[in-house]
Amino acid sequence: MVVVGKSEVRNVSMSRPKKKSLIAILSTCVLFFLVFIIGAKFQYVSVFSKFLDDRGDNESLQLLNDIEFTRLGLTPREPVIIKDVKTGKERKLHGRFLHITDIHPDPYYVEGSSIDAVCHTGKPSKKKDVAPKFGKAMSGCDSPVILMEETLRWIKENLRDKIDFVIWTGDNIRHDNDRKHPRTEAQIFDMNNIVADKMTELFSAGNEEDPRDFDVSVIPSLGNNDVFPHNMFALGPTLQTREYYRIWKNFVPQQQQRTFDRSASFLTEVIPGKLAVLSINTLYLFKANPLVDNCNSKKEPGYQLLLWFGYVLEELRSRGMKVWLSGHVPPIAKNFDQSCYDKFTLWTHEYRDIIIGGLYGHMNIDHFIPTDGKKARKSLLKAMEQSTRVQQGEDSNEEDEETELNRILDHAMAAKEVFLMGAKPSNKEAYMNTVRDTYYRKVWNKLERVDEKNVENEKKKKEKKDKKKKKPITRKELIERYSIVNIGGSVIPTFNPSFRIWEYNITDIVNDSNFAVSEYKPWDEFFESLNKIMEDSLLEDEMDSSNIEVGINREKMGEKKNKKKKKNDKTMPIEMPDKYELGPAYVPQLFTPTRFVQFYADLEKINQELHNSFVESKDIFRYEIEYTSDEKPYSMDSLTVGSYLDLAGRLYENKPAWEKYVEWSFASSGYKDD
């Protein structure tokens, strides 16, 4: 009977009605091809999509859908429908999200003004000194407002209906680089309010009764230029933390208002009971913040932030959830106070069963840094031993003075580097070469020493020959010690404007009772308990661990006899218990990132086309695919930590691959050090 059916289908396919259908489809394809060629340049594809939608031609719509995804470099896939058992609300999951950062809109930007006058005023001295409509890469000017508006319009027309959430990592105001127009706190708040309103308008569900109802969740974080003075941010509650809660009231869950007032950090469930994003106020760890000395004293903002961080991670683990970390300043040694860097790195390492990765901005260079959790723990233990010796008078005061001097110099250097980020880029190739020669080289050396086939035999030989020598480790052990810090390219034309779409695994998501989270303490109860803990930590010298409702076991360090036992540091995690398995960052599973697509706007080409054309600017401005993670030199099958370490090794040993990687790091702007 099936065979008969097939025969009948083949016969019917030659009948007149089917021929008409075939001709219609072919005609549609030809028409679409012509529109697609034009649309690739002028972005008319969405108009044609509406035309087909009105016709109701399902076959043509499917074809269009596939071509549309191909045009955008995205993996075509059917969305998954999920339902929140508590609210009863259904939504589509696409398995993609957007990371966008460092927009830096400048209302003083004037088209045709002098680049030498930061594009604010003045008559250009030469053709190259003219400020173009959409901004100029490597000029040192901030983003014209139209660049921000056209970027968001392009996202709306091309990506909004294909993503699940947006990670937006700060710096939504111009740099303070014009003495004629010094920034004020009011201006900073006003522009952040404007950008937040635009994000709300773009991604909200349009529900007037519930302004927190979003089709696409938005998770903002605070940039170092979003505060006044820039870089300086005190532990809350302050005017600034309260003002940002007002500005972000639609993004920050209401039950977290008190914790946000204190830390300007919060948690968002982007898939209820399954997946969360943490917005981390990295300014409390930032060495350029003059109010940050270290992360060891309870009164330090960094200590309080890490305390919050630890309790939230443990709660997410207890609920069986996975989490992305996000923030403005990347958590690398260059940016953070040493104790803050070591502790933050250690937390990400010891919660590798739930942390998927970290997304950051600030540096305007598209690249990644592997951070070593095992090394961070060693560094912390060494610092604690040294601190104990100082307290016992075993070290001289001169060493203490030298440490303080180094700290002051670190603050000064960091502040200078941050100031230069608002100027024309310089020495960025030198920085990237440092990344290659330190981080990537070390990874390559370690990978070279790992030989899975012979490692067990080598271990036995080493044990017999000399027990004091280091034992070789397996590839799995090597990979486990690392986490990946992803640093995004920026919208501001330090180079070319850019952003990234991440794709992740949603294959195993099903619409069932697993989405119910009623067996866990409601989030408002958790955060109420956490608020009490945070307040007590500032008032008491030592908190009685028996009073902690949100349990985190703390590491204990033994002391010699007749010496005072060292108090536990609650901002240091214990080692990850063996009962927990590696999470999505290490082993392909639900929520593992699978690939990404990097988009950029070629400003030189766009401005030139605008100059030579009578077409409206909105029909010329566009983002293009710069590269994807599965093409050379990336050639990544997935975005696990192991894949990133392999890439780091290839980039170190393969010069052509490295050169291409650096070209993309600067958003194909052609940047070179002077």
UniProtKB/Swiss-Prot annotation:
There is a cross-link at residue 6 (Glycyl lysine isopeptide (Lys-Gly) (interchain with G-Cter in ubiquitin)). Residues 1-83, 385-674 form a propeptide. Processing by proteases in the vacuole is required for activation. One of its GO terms (biological process) is polyphosphate metabolic process. The chain crosses the membrane at residues 22-42. The gene is PPN1. Glycans are attached at residues 58, 505, 511. Divalent metal cations. Exopolyphosphatase activity is predominant in the presence of Co(2+), while endopolyphosphatase activity is predominant in the presence of Mg(2+). Co(2+) is more effective than Mn(2+) for dATP phosphohydrolase activity. The yeast vacuole plays an important role in Zn(2+) storing and sequestering. Therefore, the changes in Zn(2+) concentration may regulate the enzyme's activity. The keyword Phosphoprotein does not apply. PANTHER family: ENDOPOLYPHOSPHATASE, SPHINGOMYELIN PHOSPHODIESTERASE. The keyword Endoplasmic reticulum does not apply. Homotetramer. Interacts with PPN2. Its cofactor is Mn(2+); Mg(2+); Co(2+); Zn(2+). GO terms for molecular function: endopolyphosphatase activity; exopolyphosphatase activity; metal ion binding. Inhibited by heparin and EDTA. It catalyses: [phosphate](n+1) + n H2O = (n+1) phosphate + n H(+); [phosphate](n) + H2O = [phosphate](n-1) + phosphate + H(+); dATP + H2O = dADP + phosphate + H(+). Residues 384-403 are annotated as: Disordered. Inactivation of PPN1 leads to the inhibition of expression of both exopolyphosphatase PPX1 and high-molecular-mass exopolyphosphatase not encoded by PPX1. Present with 319 molecules/cell in log phase SD medium. Optimum pH is about 7.5. GO terms for cellular component: cytosol; fungal-type vacuole; fungal-type vacuole membrane; nucleus. This is Endopolyphosphatase. It is a single-pass type II membrane protein. InterPro entries: ASMase/PPN1_MPP, Calcineurin-like_PHP_ApaH, EndopolyPtase_N1, Metallo-depent_PP-like.
